[in-house]
């Protein structure tokens, strides 16, 4: 399907065949349910245990960590405007970089990664930007994200699955990185699920290493406008002017946390509805596959 197959054939110097045709599609939930035994392992399953149970009939069990987690997770730092948030992000990176602390910044898009890189360059800070364009090269770059003084900017999907070691891939400068405070994770947006934010936080503090994570967001971010944060916050509590400082009103911060729970609940409900809609098609699929299997095994014949 698409142009991937012809592109690979041309690259390898073989005869280019016609494009493939999609003969059938199996939703992920039903595909996984076809396995007689189903299990998985992830560091962020607990926050989605309701979804695992309702969609896959799977329970979540927490396995104690081998060593205690020493990472310090700071609460969300919320600003009124995106401009104030952008300034706060740069001001957070500057002192960390000055003391040689490695920094990994997570952004929601390639464009925002490049914008942040330009702002840091104006401050004399050189950063490595990962934008999911070259997985092999970027995997090598992110392995070095734990080296002292390194600043790495990663778009949402890039660099996943790579273990970041303090001091670099060979850990030759680990003592220096530890002395600087370990890997600082800086999130610049709130995910639509707690799991997403925990995945970013979890890039630091692995295997008992020290580290910290911060999230700097604003009331103008996409998730806030999508779920109309302004309507959730009582008028007397909604900030009227940007002060350049984080919002400390507990009512505002409570509603900011609530936004993520609303988004996560909406996503779960959407998946549950899709599951119901595709159930009918799956019954037909089971019937067709059953007949096909019977023909292939000789248990049935065509009249």
Protein language model annotation of sequence segments:
Residues 93-100, 110-182:
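Conserved motor-coupling elements within RecA-like helicase/translocase cores
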Residues 50-75, 84-102, 111-126, 253-261:
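Helicase motor core with emphasis on the C-terminal RecA-like subdomain
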Residues 12, 36, 56-58, 100, ...:
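Short glycine-/polar-rich loops that comprise or flank the Walker A/P-loop
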Residues 41, 63, 106-108, 123, ...:
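Generic beta-strand/beta-sheet core signal
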Residues 3, 24, 37, 45-47, ...:
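Conserved nucleotide-binding/hydrolysis micro-motifs of P-loop NTPases
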Residues 1-83, 87-89, 132, 143-144, ...:
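A contiguous, basic/glycine-rich beta-loop/short-helix subdomain that forms a polymer-engagement track
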Residues 175-303:
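C-terminal helicase module of SF1/SF2 nucleic-acid helicases/translocases
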């Amino acid at each position: 399907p698409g142009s991937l197959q012809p592109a690979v054939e041309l690259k390898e110097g073989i005869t280019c065949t016609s494009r493939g045709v999609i003969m059938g599609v199996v939703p992920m939930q039903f595909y996984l349910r076809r396995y007689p035994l189903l299990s998985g392992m992830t560091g962020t399953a607990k926050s989605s245990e309701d979804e695992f149970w309702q969609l896959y009939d799977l329970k979540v069990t927490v396995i104690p960590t081998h060593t205690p987690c020493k990472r310090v997770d700071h609460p969300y730092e919320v600003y009124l405007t995106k401009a104030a948030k952008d300034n706060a992000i740069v001001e957070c990176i500057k002192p960390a970089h000055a003391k040689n602390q490695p920094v990994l910044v997570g952004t929601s898009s390639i464009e925002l990664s490049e914008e942040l890189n330009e702002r840091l360059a104006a401050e004399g800070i050189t950063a490595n930007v990962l934008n999911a364009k070259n997985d092999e090269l970027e995997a090598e770059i992110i392995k070095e994200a734990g080296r002292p003084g390194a600043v790495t900017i990663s778009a949402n999907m890039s660099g996943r699955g790579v273990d970041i070691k303090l001091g670099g891939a060979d850990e030759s400068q680990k003592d220096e990185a530890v002395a600087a405070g370990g890997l600082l994770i800086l999130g610049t947006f709130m995910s639509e699920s707690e799991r997403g934010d925990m995945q970013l936080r979890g890039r630091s503090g692995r295997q008992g290493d020290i580290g910290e994570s911060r999230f700097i967001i604003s009331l103008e971010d996409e998730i806030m406008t999508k779920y109309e944060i302004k309507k959730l916050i009582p008028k007397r509590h909604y900030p009227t002017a940007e002060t350049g400082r984080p919002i400390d009103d507990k009512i505002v911060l409570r509603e900011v946390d609530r936004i993520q729970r609303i988004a996560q609940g909406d996503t779960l409900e959407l998946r549950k509805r899709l599951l119901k809609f595709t159930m009918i098609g799956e019954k037909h699929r089971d019937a067709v596959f059953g007949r096909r299997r019977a023909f292939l095994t000789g248990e049935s014949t065509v009249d």
